[in-house]
Amino acid sequence: QYLKGRTLDELKATTANDAGLWPDDHEGFLDSRAFYAGKTASDGTNRYIWGWCPTRPGNDNTNVGANPNEPEWAGNLVAHKLIQHEDGTLTLGAVEGIDAKYAKQGEAAVMAKSDEGVTEAGGTYTLTGDAYLLFSRLNVHNKISFTVKTASADDKFGLSLCRGTDSDKYYSIIVNPEGGGKRKINFEEEGPEGKGFIDGIDGYVFNAPADNEYRVTVYTDNSVCVVYINDNVAYTNRIYGNQKNCWSVNSYGGTVEISGVDVRYY
């Protein structure tokens, strides 16, 4: 089902008395507030959408233009592939041509880890409590892939960029439990001098996977960052300073398994 209307009144009429007819997932969103003015086109087989990722005044990752302000409406183009699921819902995924560009093998060595809460067996890491793994420095254009298996639907985990062993602040994309088997991507400035949760740039609510497995792929191109999870979640943000810096995977109080860590670049 899709909403169609030639005028605003016609569009409103299509939604009258429709309680229960439309799925609540995604709340009508395809991406974060850092993707705007999207247009779509087809290659005859697949449909794609491209739009803009806004810049941040003063290159400040926390100055996202939260309500009542507005983001800095300028920036760089971001493209996604539109995915239509069996129930008719739409999500966004990676564009094959963009993915293929990240062809060079990068380094994914563990440079540091939390003093407690990290074990490793056969290339799979288990993080327990407030734990992290810090990986080697990224390039300028990066593709980061890994799989997270949580012990429950309420275990919290995330990825941090611009992070070192003694950073006063760094920037985290966190898969946060929202209760009732729901999740949401939050953006936080962590560290001793960090502001914590950044309002106005969190993602949309989505269902936790039944098997608690999250296949995460992150693309960075200079300061533009796009995250995909399970072909079901897309999240775009602008994160200055991620180039040539280390990155980490984190747990927050629960137990998560990290496997298949891979870094590519061009």
Indicate where each model-derived feature is located.
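Beta-rich carbohydrate-recognition and catalytic domains
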Residues: Q1-D31, C53-K113, N222, N232-V233, ...
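Beta-strand-rich interaction surfaces with strong enrichment in secreted/lumenal proteins
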Residues: D25-G28, A131-R137, L159, I201-A208, ...
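Beta-propeller and closely related beta-sheet repeat lectin domains
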Residues: Y36-K39
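Entry beta-strands of beta-propeller and related beta-repeat scaffolds
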Residues: N46-I49, L90
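Secretory/extracellular carbohydrate-interaction modules
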Residues: G122-G191
